[in-house]
Design a protein with these regions (language model features):
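Conserved donor-binding/catalytic core segment of Leloir-type glycosyltransferases
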Residues: 4-6, 140, 164, 173-192, ...
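Glycosyltransferase donor-sugar binding loop
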Residues: 38-42, 184, 213-228
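Membrane-proximal helix-turn-helix segments that form the acceptor-binding/catalytic region
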Residues: 121-139
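Nucleotide-activated donor-binding/catalytic signature segment of Leloir-type glycosyltransferases, i.e.
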Residues: 227-248
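Short alpha-helical donor nucleotide-sugar binding micro-motif in glycosyltransferases
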Residues: 247-248, 255-260
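Aromatic "clamp/platform" in nucleotide-sugar-dependent glycosyltransferases that forms part
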Residues: 268
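Short hydrophobic beta-strand element within catalytic cores of glycosyltransferases
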Residues: 285-289
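Conserved acidic donor-binding segment of nucleotide-sugar-dependent glycosyltransferases
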Residues: 300-312, 320-326
Length: 363
């Protein structure tokens, strides 16, 4: 099977698809003949060393005829994302040649995501994206929760998650005094629910201080996010509880994970957050809202604590995590067990099966 992957990724380390897309394609290449075409220049030099990777700087002008000869008629095409106008030229060729394609929206089609920049989304949907999604052979959602929250889109769909490789080092000991909760990811107040987290902490600030809880947020300062957060922290006098840090990567990121007692993520919406799966793979218990799309799995596995996407719910989740301190080693082992479900090669095999079904339906 010839599978053509199309993306528009600059390769910033703080973006989840920078990590998940290459790993997905790498493991798919063990089963299928793949070509990965990125419709912009990447800052990741290691991608250029991959035998199946190409870069096209034509953007909107990229067409199927620009592909290598053996991939000008692929069996199926995968668009890594939805809201990318550079996909437009290629998709017209696919419609003309009746080549099936799959769109991977990564939460972009959920109800909450559609509320972000709603006018821009409305105009974009009317101009192109309604038809782009509607004519897809299928949408690949990363979780059942994402699929359910994207129910307004009537395109056939299936669920295949992101994966994670096992970690050589995992969490072994927890703090004797106090608790350290960490978040690593984008500092987007709305999507990541950081405003909800700050408000929740303000409700139980005395309890958090008494338990010596500190919450460390790591991520790039983009669009004035740090200034906004610092203003909120000062308003609620939370500067001794919530701390802001620049993004961490590689060995520094691993150190932060292993020095933390739990990973916290209070997102309003996600596809499948690689940061949280990675934290589970280190054996970190998780504090997760329903918007992360992992809350149900974490609750069922007893790998952490969960809440709805409300300030009161997050406050109660924090209380539960503080009260449960003696159970952190047990929840750590459960986190490792949960992360083992996200094996990349098994995911590639499941994806191959879904692609085969799509191709066979079209024959």
């Amino acid at each position: 099977m010839k599978v053509l992957f199309i993306s528009k990724l600059e390769g910033h380390k703080w973006q989840g698809p920078t990590h998940s897309v290459p790993m997905q394609i790498k493991h798919q290449s063990n089963i299928d003949e793949v070509l990965w075409v990125n419709l912009c220049a990447s800052i990741n030099p290691e991608w250029k060393d991959l035998p199946y990777y190409r870069e096209s700087e034509k953007g909107l002008k990229t067409r199927l005829a620009d592909m290598p000869a053996d991939f000008q008629k692929p069996d199926i095409v995968v668009f890594e994302g939805v809201y990318e106008y550079p996909f437009a030229g290629l998709v017209y060729d696919l419609w003309a040649r009746k080549i099936p394609y799959v769109a991977v929206p990564r939460s972009a089609l959920t109800a909450d995501a559609q509320k972000k920049k709603p006018l821009k989304k409305l105009l974009g949907n009317m101009a192109f994206f309604n038809v782009f999604v509607g004519k897809a052979a299928a949408i690949q959602y990363l979780t059942a929760a994402e699929q359910k929250d994207s129910a307004k889109w009537k395109t056939p769909s299936f669920v295949v998650p992101n994966g994670m490789l096992p970690k050589e080092r995992t969490k072994q000991t927890f703090s004797n005094e106090g608790l350290i909760f960490s978040y690593i990811g984008r500092m987007e107040q709305y999507q990541k629910g950081l405003d909800l987290l700050v408000s929740a902490c303000s409700r139980i600030v005395r309890e958090l201080r008494a338990a010596k809880v500190t919450i460390h947020l790591y991520g790039p300062d983009r669009e004035g996010s740090f200034a906004q957060l610092r203003e909120e922290l000062a308003r609620y006098s939370l500067e001794d509880i919530i701390f802001l840090h620049d993004g961490v990567f590689g060995e520094d990121k691993e150190r932060v994970q292993l020095e933390s007692d739990a990973f916290i993520m209070t997102s309003r919406f996600e596809g499948l957050p690689m940061g949280m799966i990675e934290a589970l793979a280190y054996g970190l218990p998780a504090l997760a809202t329903t918007g992360t799309n992992l809350a149900e799995e974490i609750r069922d596995a007893e790998a952490g604590w969960t809440s709805d996407n409300s300030v009161d719910g997050i406050a109660q989740m924090l209380r539960a995590a503080v009260a449960d301190k003696d159970r952190y080693p047990e929840r750590s082992q459960n986190a490792l067990g949960l992360s083992a479900q996200y094996n990349w090669q098994a995911i590639a095999e499941k994806t191959h099966g879904e692609f085969s079904n799509i191709i066979n339906r079209g024959k």
